[in-house]
Amino acid sequence: MCNQTPLRSMALDSSGKQPEQQQQQQPRASSGNGEARLKLRRTPNEEHEPENYEDLPLDYSPSLFTSLERYLPEQLLNSTRIDKASFMRDLLLRYSPDTERVRVLRHKEYRDKIMSSYQRLHGEIYTLDPSSFFAPSFLGAFSRKSEPNFRSSMVESYPGIFTFEMFKPQFCEMLLAEVEHMEKWVYDSRSTIMRPNTMNNFGVVLDDFGFDSMLQKLVDDFISPIAQVLFPEVCGTSLDSHHGYIVEYGKDRDVDLGFHVDDSEVSLNVCLGKQFSGGELYFRGVRCDKHVNSDSTEKEVYDYSHVPGHAILHRGRHRHGARATTSGHRANLILWCRSSTFREMKNYQRDFSGWCGGCKLDKQRRQRDSINATKEILARKAAEKTLVELASKSCAE
């Protein structure tokens, strides 16, 4: 289960756990045919079109293999799909801790059990179809993948928070119907499913029901290009993994959501409907781990009201929560988008003033202190010079 990091309540508002990052070695693995060990690329090959691994019996998520393929050395890119899968599997098994390996295998068994029993209601929405899913304004932004095009279809309603129309009403209705069908299957089969995170008691992890590849393609083809333009400090390279789920609020569902940060570099939140009141999101500044519980400033206060079919895109470290849904039923698609490169680089950094409000305040404080200290030194030297001049003048007289 993915976690969110709940935060202590903030003075400005009444209203998952960020995992410890392990020190990772530079991966090397045998090609399986006696060749010297090959090293992964440091950055993904964006021009390479990776394979689909859905039909192979793998120990890890097929989308992980698809994402990892972009990092393969040039010597392997033209190998057969089986050879590439074998190389990547060997790599993952070699560098995954035993506990992680066991967790992954158990999760795979859990997903396989669901997939073998669950009968899809709308099979067509499990494959990304941009023309059927997306609003024309969102599709238009991708006629040319440029910053002016992206910004023309989005509103930066607050620094670092972008809102835009994304899904057609018909797609929202079909996805909601599919989720209701999932919940009926869970009830009828007396199954137990994992909830999206540690803070939501209701909702469905879409990846566990077969949406993994569709959502990863959504990240690769649409969210990642946008994020690299809008959030270059955390998405200088591709977003290479995700966690996608549905949350539900209202009667007999969750009521609100506490103050927290997401386990993501960039988060996409799309309201699917239905009729509801309340449920506004409140944001209170971007923070790194060190400053995650620091106070907010008045300039960091921003509230957002959901609109069905419309999305809000923000940094995962942008602290936020959801107020109570006072009537009706609200359902949202949440997509946590992650960058393994950024997470690795973050292990070696101490200053995040490029995006953390707390680090930025600390840096400004240090700069002010340095300027004041320099002024004091200059003033002291000027005073000493004046005293020397007065003493010299006195001696001369």
Curated annotation (Swiss-Prot):
The UniProt disruption phenotype note reads:
Altered plant morphology, including epinastic (curved downward) cotyledons, hyponastic (curved up) leaves, and reduced palisade mesophyll cell size. Reduced number of leaves at bolting and early flowering. The double mutant seedlings icu11 and cp2 skip the vegetative phase, flower immediately after germination and then die.
Binding locations of 2-oxoglutarate: 330
Please describe the organ and tissue distribution of this protein's expression. Answer: Expressed in roots, cotyledons, rosette leaves, cauline leaves and inflorescences.
- Renumbered to this chain, the Low complexity biased-composition regions fall at 18-27
Required co-factor(s) are: Fe(2+); L-ascorbate
Cofactor binding remark:
Binds 1 Fe(2+) ion per subunit.
Where Fe cation is bound, by residue? 260, 262, 320
Q: Pfam families per the record?
A: OGFOD2-like
Q: Where in the cell is it found?
A: Nucleus, Nucleoplasm
Q: Name one GO molecular function term.
A: oxidoreductase activity, acting on paired donors, with incorporation or reduction of molecular oxygen
Domain called Fe2OG dioxygenase: residue spans: 238-339
Q: Which GO terms describe its cellular component?
A: nucleoplasm; nucleus
Q: What class of enzyme is it?
A: oxidoreductase
Annotated region Disordered: the residues are 1-56
Q: What does this protein do?
A: Participates in the epigenetic repression of flowering genes in association with CP2. Functions in the repression of several members of the MADS-box transcription factors family, including SEP3, during vegetative development via histone modification.
Looking up PANTHER family in the UniProt record yields: 2-OXOGLUTARATE AND IRON-DEPENDENT OXYGENASE DOMAIN-CONTAINING PROTEIN 2 (PTHR24014), 2-OXOGLUTARATE AND IRON-DEPENDENT OXYGENASE DOMAIN-CONTAINING PROTEIN ICU11 (PTHR24014:SF8)
Protein name in UniProt: 2-oxoglutarate and iron-dependent oxygenase domain-containing protein ICU11
Q: Which gene encodes it?
A: ICU11
